[in-house]
C-alpha cells in the first residue's frame, strides 16, 4: 500500500498533475480521488470527465472549503468511462454506497423513518412496513422513507380492507383457510385458492397507492365498475364501488391539499446545522400531497450537492410512472441538467428541475423547508438529551472524555440450553444497530441443565477482543470499533469474570468496563466491593439502563430464534441421509416442517439436492402408515 511519505499530493507536483489530467478523456464517466494512503476519498461523475476533474485543481475556480481541502489531499486520480450519462449516474451511486468516501455526501441510515416493502420476488407478494431496506433482492420494491408512521399504518390498514390481501405471514391451519377468507378479507393465499397471477394484479393496485397514483387507480376502477354494471354483474360493480369509496377516503385523509393541476411534481428542501442535514421530499399528484419522505445526511457539503445526492438515490430504483414531470428544489443542483436528462430518458417524457422564485411553487418549497426545520429541531433536542446523558455518565465514572461508543453485553438461555450472547452498541447515546452482534456460546461446560453466565461472558469478551490481543501493532487510536466503555448486564460476579479475561489478554488497562445490576440499578467497578452511589433517575444511569435493556432484548430474541430453529431441525435430524445443508434447503423451499409433511414425494424432489429416493424417504418418515 502506498503511503503519504512516498507520494506527494498532486497539487505539490504540477508536472505529474498535468500529465495525469491529460490522460483523462472528455467523455462521460466516473472518477475516483485517492489520498496518500490509497483510500478513495471522493467519487464523482461528469458528462465530460477531463474538464470536471481539471476544475478541482484550477486556480480561482469556485470551490467549497471542503472540496478545496479534498483537492489538496489527492495523490492519484482514476476513472471509468461509460457510454452515457445515465450509466455514469447509476455507477456513481453504487460506488459511493460501496466505498463510503469521506468527502462525498453520505445519507445516514435513520431507522426512525419506515418504508413499505412489496416482495415481488415471491409468487404471492407480501406488503409490510419495515425500517430496514434490504438490498439483496432486486425485484422487491421499497416505498419511502415516510415521515408519518401512524398515517402509513393507516393507509396500509385501509388498503388491506379495500383489497383482499393475505393477512398472515404464515397459515393458521394446514388444510383450510382461516376466517379471513370466509369474511372476504383474504383470497385464501395460504391454500393457493387464488393463482399467483391474479393475486399479483391485486397487489399492483395497492402499489399504485404508494406510487402516488391513487386518482389514476380510481379512474381505472370507475371504468371497470361501469362495464360490470352494463353487463348486469351488480355484485362485482358493488365491490368495485366500495373499493373506490375506500380509496377516496385515503385521498381525503391527506394532510395538505394544493391547488388542483394535472402536473405531477416533487418538492425537496432541507434544514441543516453544523452536523446534520434533514431533508424532506413532498410528492404532489393531481394537486394533492400524497407522500412525505424524509432523509438525513451529513451537512459538510453545499446544500445543492446534498439535495442532488438525495434525489439521485431516491430515483435510482423508481419506476417510470413514479418519476414526476417537475422537481422543485430549494437550492440549485450542481448537476441538475444531467439528472433531468437521465430522468427524462427513463420516464419517456420531459422532466424539468428548477428552483421556483415566486407564487405558489415558491410557497410550496417554503412549506417543505419549514417541515425540514421542525425535524432538525427534533433531532437537535434528542441530541442534546443524549449529550447530557453521556456527560453525566462521564462524570459518574470519572472518564477523561465523553463515551462515544458504548458496548453492552448480556447472556440468554434456558437452564443452559441454546446459550447465546448479545453485543449491542450505542454511538453518542443512540443505538447503532448496524454494529450489533450475537454469539453462540461454544463453552463445553455450558450444557442443558448446567448454565454458567460467568464463563459465557468471559468467552464472548475473549472472542470480541482476540484480534487486538494477538496483534499488539493493531492501533486502537482512532479505531471506530474500539469501545470507550463496556457495560456488562449483571453484578460483581459477572464483572469479575470479564475483568479476569481482559487481564489475561493484557487489555484491561486499555478498556473501561463496568456492570449494571438489575437490583436497584447498581453500578459496579472493577476491584470495588460496593456499588457507586448514584440516583436511578440520573441521565447517565438512564442511558446505561437503555443500553442494558436493549442488550437483554437482543439476546432474548436471538435465543428464541435459536430455539425455534432447533425445534424445526430436530425432527428433520431423524431422517437418514438428510444433512444440515439439505435441511436448510427444504425449510427455505417449504417455509415450515408442516408444509414438508403435506408435500408429495414429487414436490419434495423439486428441491435442489433432493433426489427421488431421498424425497421418498422424507415422505415415508412423515407418513409411516404408507410404508
Curated annotation (Swiss-Prot):
It is found in: Cytoplasm. It comes from the Bacteria. One of its GO terms (molecular function) is excinuclease ABC activity. Keywords: Cytoplasm, DNA damage, DNA excision, DNA repair, Excision nuclease, SOS response. SMART domains: GIYc, HhH1. CDD domains: GIY-YIG_UvrC_Cho (cd10434). Disulfide bonds: none annotated. GO terms for biological process: nucleotide-excision repair; SOS response. Its main location: cytoplasm. InterPro entries: DisA/LigA_HHH, GIY-YIG_endonuc, GIY-YIG_endonuc_sf, GIY-YIG_UvrC_Cho, Hlx-hairpin-Hlx_DNA-bd_motif, RuvA_2-like, UVR_dom, UVR_dom_sf. Residues 26-105 form the GIY-YIG domain. Coiled coil: none annotated. GO terms for cellular component: cytoplasm; excinuclease repair complex. Residues 215-250 form the UVR domain. Belongs to the UvrC family. The UvrABC repair system catalyzes the recognition and processing of DNA lesions. UvrC both incises the 5' and 3' sides of the lesion. The N-terminal half is responsible for the 3' incision and the C-terminal half is responsible for the 5' incision. This is UvrABC system protein C. It comes from Trichormus variabilis (strain ATCC 29413 / PCC 7937).
